[in-house]
Amino acid sequence: MKINPDIFREYDIRGIYPENFNKEAAYQIGRVFADYTKVKNVLIGRDMRLSSPEILKGLSQGLIEQGVDVFDAGLVPIDFVYSMVPKNNFNAGIMITASHNPKEYNGLKMILWQRKPWIEPISGKLIKNLIDKKIKPAKKKGKIKKINLWKKYLSHIFSFVDLKKIKPLKIVVDAGNGLAGKVIPLIAKKIPCRIIPLFFKLDGNFPNHSPNPFEKGAMDKLIKKVVKERADFGVFFDGDTDRIVLVDEKGEPLFGDLQLLLLAKKFLKEHPKSAIVYKVDQSRAVKEFIEKMGGKPIRTKVGYFYTAKAMRENKAILGGETSCHFAFKDNFYADSGFIAFLIFLEIISQSNKKLSELVKEFKIYSKIHIPAIKVKNKEKVIEFLKRKYKNGKIDQLDGLTVEYNNWWFNLRPSNTEPVIRLTIEAKTNKLLKEKLSELKKLIKNL
């Protein structure tokens, strides 16, 4: 079978099932993964997507034929695989998931552990370059075994907080029919909070809303429920739970910048002068407040792969993204929605303030992110704007960033679509609207 090359991405593998990612593709990828990594065992977890059992069969078969022992963890969140691989001395881990993509998709996220303080993500593009290699089956086949590591996993995530410091808050949790519906009830047994559940039944059809919090309308039901119940705050988890979005008591989503600063304030108080990783598309406030709090801000490209790399290189204690991924040094430099959730619980409990009051100090700029602007020629747009705004401070760490004293923008081309992503921020809402209109006109006229 010839595999569609478009499914191999920088950080993972994702495609529509069964057209371009299916049992046969998973089988081939399993064989290539085994041949390349030379691992002896792999921990595999999967999300609740309807195609995940079939993908598991193909993937496991490919690994076993190459002599790899497969340990099937069952339906688990992605941070379960990230943390339980090193915690239990597995050589590697694979999560069957398409994260926040629509129900038609499925995919794989792959990691290695080489007895270091971190896990190593395996690029989908690396697998792509090896997919046509002829591989001889191993003389001795591997075995498959089911394994239950839930007790160890829960012990690990609870180790990030002092449960005695968590107060009886009222929280609306939107699991979106994803894995949070399985994990939050287990967490709830250990905390004094009242959890109001939304869409906890696991369902790969995602019948209630998109698993992507940035999709229009995805958070509407959560926002309404938080206000109606007069809850302390609300929480949205995406499908595989590696992203978490908080909603304050007024029904306003906080997203990545404000959430990262909440975490940074706590971490820098406990670990002064530590490095914290942030992204090129995050608010200028992130850098400024990390410095103000005595930390060392490390700016890097968008994407989990780059977060993990920058954290390792700078021994950062924390990393975050606009997309609401939060990675922790003590979680093997990997992200976890549930560790973030527990830490937010402790922060809010100990503050004796409403969530909206906690983040008020960080709201010093106006910002807009436009995830997709269709263009004919991405490179032409970037080169034109680079010339147009040549009197600003320019850098091209990730796309094009141009900074002025009272406003800035970042433009990043998509790797797979004819679109560009625009982030723009200004000191005032009026200036933001002016500059956004200016940029849109320039891009449209090209």
Question: What is the role of each PLM region?
Answer:
Residues 106-229:
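Gly/Ser/Thr-enriched, mixed-charge loops and adjacent short helices
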Residues 269-446:
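Phosphate-binding and adjacent anionic-ligand microenvironments
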Residues 41-47, 71, 170-172, 274-280, ...:
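Short glycine-rich phosphate-binding loop at a beta-alpha junction
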Residues 1-67, 146-170:
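An N-terminal, well-structured beta->alpha segment
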Residues 91-99, 103-105, 226-248, 253, ...:
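Glycine-rich phosphate-binding loop
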Residues 42-106, 187-247:
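N-terminal small/polar loop signature for handling phosphorylated ligands or for N-terminal nucleophile
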